[in-house]
Curated annotation (Swiss-Prot):
Chain sites annotated for binding Mg(2+) 2: 67
Protein task: The RuvA-RuvB-RuvC complex processes Holliday junction (HJ) DNA during genetic recombination and DNA repair. Endonuclease that resolves HJ intermediates. Cleaves cruciform DNA by making single-stranded nicks across the HJ at symmetrical positions within the homologous arms, yielding a 5'-phosphate and a 3'-hydroxyl group; requires a central core of homology in the junction. The consensus cleavage sequence is 5'-(A/T)TT(C/G)-3'. Cleavage occurs on the 3'-side of the TT dinucleotide at the point of strand exchange.
EC number: 3.1.21.10
Upper classification of the organism: Bacteria, Pseudomonadati, Pseudomonadota, Gammaproteobacteria, Moraxellales
Signal peptide: none
Protein name: Crossover junction endodeoxyribonuclease RuvC
GO CC field: cytoplasm; Holliday junction resolvase complex
Cofactor(s) this protein cannot do without: Mg(2+)
Length: 181
């Protein structure tokens, strides 16, 4: 039963989420944020690297998923985000984890069924898929969503299994079921 860590990189808050995949079932293990406020950038990167490394050593995930950098309107923000992402990936690779990368749109499509979903929709679906009773922080929910996306992409999670896990909430309609006869 592999453990998957998802990372939602950020220069001030880096979210992490760990799930266990057992066949078609996903189980919540841990989630939270690595806070790096009020330090200069090299110190923030050091905290991200050390935080990711500590979490991986504690839980021992065998797979990792990281959200790719989006193109921000502010180039400085995009550079900082890229640096934070690099620190997290370096920590994962340093511990011999293979890193899968997904765009925000791919993650949202996998978890919510809609690539332009908002943060609230992602949080609610993460809660539903993992049977959580408390809404995770936004960054932690995004990291859990990355881990869920990777579990879906890794092969044994069929679309039908995902729909069953959701209790039919996201029932799809075939074209034939929407036609008038």
């Amino acid at each position: 039963m592999p453990l998957i860590i998802g990372i939602d990189p950020g220069s001030r808050l880096t979210g992490y989420g760990i799930i266990e995949k057992n066949g078609n079932e996903l189980r919540f293990i841990d989630a939270g944020t690595i806070r790096t406020e009020s330090q200069d950038m090299p110190e923030r990167l050091k905290r991200i690297f050390a935080g990711v490394e500590r979490i991986v050593k504690f839980h021992g995930p065998t797979q990792a998923a990281v959200e790719q950098v989006f193109m921000a309107q502010n180039p400085d923000s995009a550079l900082k985000l890229g640096q934070a992402r690099g620190a997290a990936i370096a920590a994962l690779v340093n511990l011999d984890l293979e890193v899968a990368e997904y765009t925000a749109r791919q993650i949202k499509q996998s978890v919510v069924g809609y690539g332009a979903a908002d943060k609230e929709q992602v949080q609610m679906m993460v809660m539903r898929i993992l049977n959580l009773t408390i809404k995770p922080q936004s960054d932690a929910a995004d990291a859990l969503a990355a881990a869920i996306c990777h579990a879906h992409a890794s092969g044994s999670m069929s679309k039908m299994a995902v729909l069953n896990a959701l209790g039919g909430m996201a029932r799809g309609r075939s074209r034939s079921s929407t036609r008038r006869r």
